[in-house]
């Protein structure tokens, strides 16, 4: 079977996009190859090999389209904001569909608006949980659990550049508090309107960006840290 693969990215969060809308057998045929294709060392691609994951555009009985995502390790997350923006743009360009798209995800139906090369997504309402603390060596790490349809743990730090993300990310994600793992955001509030963030994503590792993570950081900032309703979140990818 021949499969056309398109690579797209949302501020550095890169994905392979595959059209499984017209031929549903494409999805099952691609599943065994996900880890190989996404490998940063030997995966698909030239300038930057591999990807953070693969997203499939599929038919839906309850929305315009259905999105199924697999992380680089093959796991299937509930939601990803950046890949949703990419797949909405892909669907619009491929099928010349409406500029307003309803896309089914594991976290529910999300509405996407396409305006030229810009795509916005209504992420829905966050769910907050009580402040938690995790022991790491001789330190207690406070964190704010938030669900944006997928799980996040937001950690406030003084300097995101010096955080050992590749150590603390998997350590927090593997804590019994999060039986299904968690995406971990390390944030510093620069001002009431600016947050700097780095992110460790379950099933991938540190990534250049995370849309749902940026939303989780923004709502934690507003609810607990004194930021304003409108805030700019700066990630490694932009």
Describe the role of every protein-language-model region:
Residues 1-116, 154-238:
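A glycine-rich beta-to-alpha transition motif near the start of alpha/beta enzyme domains, typified by
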Residues 9-11, 127, 148-152:
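Glycine-rich beta-alpha junction loops
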Residues 125-143, 167:
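Active-site glycine-rich loop that binds ribose-phosphate moieties when present
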Residues 121, 144, 210:
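Beta-strand scaffold of nucleotide-dependent catalytic cores
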């Amino acid at each position: 079977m021949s499969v056309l693969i398109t690579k797209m990215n949302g501020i550095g969060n890169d994905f392979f996009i595959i059209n499984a809308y017209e031929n549903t057998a494409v999805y099952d045929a691609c599943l065994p190859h996900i880890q190989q294709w996404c490998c940063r060392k030997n995966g698909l691609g030239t300038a930057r090999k591999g990807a953070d994951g693969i997203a499939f555009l599929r038919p839906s009985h309850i929305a315009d389209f259905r999105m199924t995502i697999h992380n680089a390790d093959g796991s299937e997350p509930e939601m990803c904001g950046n890949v949703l923006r990419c797949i909405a743009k892909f669907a619009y360009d491929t099928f010349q569909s409406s500029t307003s798209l309803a896309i089914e995800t594991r976290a529910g139906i999300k509405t996407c608006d396409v305006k030229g090369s810009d795509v916005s997504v209504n992420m829905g309402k966050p769910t907050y949980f009580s402040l938690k603390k995790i022991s790491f060596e001789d330190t207690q790490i406070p964190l704010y659990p938030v669900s944006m349809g997928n799980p996040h743990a937001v950690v406030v730090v003084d300097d995101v550049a010096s955080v050992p993300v590749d150590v603390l990310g998997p350590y927090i994600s593997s804590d019994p508090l999060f039986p299904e793992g968690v995406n971990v955001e390390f944030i510093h509030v620069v001002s009431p309107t600016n947050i700097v963030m780095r992110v460790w994503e379950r099933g991938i590792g540190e990534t250049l960006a995370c849309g749902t993570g940026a939303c989780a950081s923004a709502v934690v900032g507003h609810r607990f840290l004194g930021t304003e309703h409108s805030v700019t979140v700066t990630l490694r990818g932009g």
